[in-house]
């Protein structure tokens, strides 16, 4: 028995139209799949942690406990932790044996070496090319062109949280170069 075209129970699509739809749909799916990573690349990542901050972590990736940290570090010390963006960041122990309100990114502004704290000279000295920074991270001797980047350090619930420093650099009185 022959069916009439245009009846409501039979779709009005031939083989050629179906194959065109299938080909176009597949090509569109592949194109969108390839476009997704490109679009994601241009969208900035969301800040991790609480309120845009990151909890300081030790070398093993564990959260640093302030009470344990202060028991192990003397006043006026600087100790490395994992900070913003996973960069090594110094936690500052103040003269009154409390955590400072800022942390210092330990990456040298000359060539990106990690700058160790020299406690005997009370400054940071880069092992790569000899750049020196005072105890606040301000550059005092080149070839490094800029001071170490700052991060806010706040203590809550026995944890240290680093957040981005966006206001004026207290060491130079200028806008921060790292924002």
Swiss-Prot record:
One of its GO terms (molecular function) is electron transporter, transferring electrons within cytochrome b6/f complex of photosystem II activity. Residues 61-162 form the Rieske domain. Disulfide bonds join 113-128. Binds 1 [2Fe-2S] cluster per subunit. The keyword ATP-binding does not apply. It catalyses: 2 oxidized [plastocyanin] + a plastoquinol + 2 H(+)(in) = 2 reduced [plastocyanin] + a plastoquinone + 4 H(+)(out). Gene3D superfamilies: Rieske [2Fe-2S] iron-sulphur domain (2.102.10.10), Single helix bin (1.20.5.700). Its cofactor is [2Fe-2S] cluster. [2Fe-2S] cluster binds at residues 108, 110, 126, 129. One of its GO terms (cellular component) is plasma membrane-derived thylakoid membrane. The 4 large subunits of the cytochrome b6-f complex are cytochrome b6, subunit IV (17 kDa polypeptide, PetD), cytochrome f and the Rieske protein, while the 4 small subunits are PetG, PetL, PetM and PetN. The complex functions as a dimer. Belongs to the Rieske iron-sulfur protein family. This is Cytochrome b6-f complex iron-sulfur subunit. The lineage of its organism: Bacteria, Bacillati, Cyanobacteriota, Cyanophyceae, Gomontiellales.
């Amino acid at each position: 028995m022959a069916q009439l075209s245009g009846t409501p129970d039979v779709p009005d699509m031939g083989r050629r139209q179906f194959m065109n739809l299938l080909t176009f749909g597949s090509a569109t799916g592949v194109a969108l799949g390839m476009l997704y990573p490109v679009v994601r690349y241009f969208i900035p990542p969301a800040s991790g942690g609480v309120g845009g901050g990151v909890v300081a972590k030790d070398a093993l990736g564990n959260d640093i406990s302030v009470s344990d940290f202060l028991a192990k570090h003397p006043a006026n010390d600087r100790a490395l932790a994992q900070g913003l963006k996973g960069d090594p960041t110094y936690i500052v122990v103040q003269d009154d044996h409390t955590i400072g309100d800022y942390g210092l990114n330990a990456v040298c502004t000359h060539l990106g070496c990690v700058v160790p704290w020299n406690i005997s000279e009370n400054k940071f000295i880069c092992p790569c090319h000899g750049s020196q920074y005072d105890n606040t991270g301000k550059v005092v001797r080149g070839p490094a062109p800029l001071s170490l980047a700052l991060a806010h350090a706040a203590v809550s619930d026995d944890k240290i949280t680093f957040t981005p420093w966006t206001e004026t650099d207290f060491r130079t009185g200028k806008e921060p170069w790292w924002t």
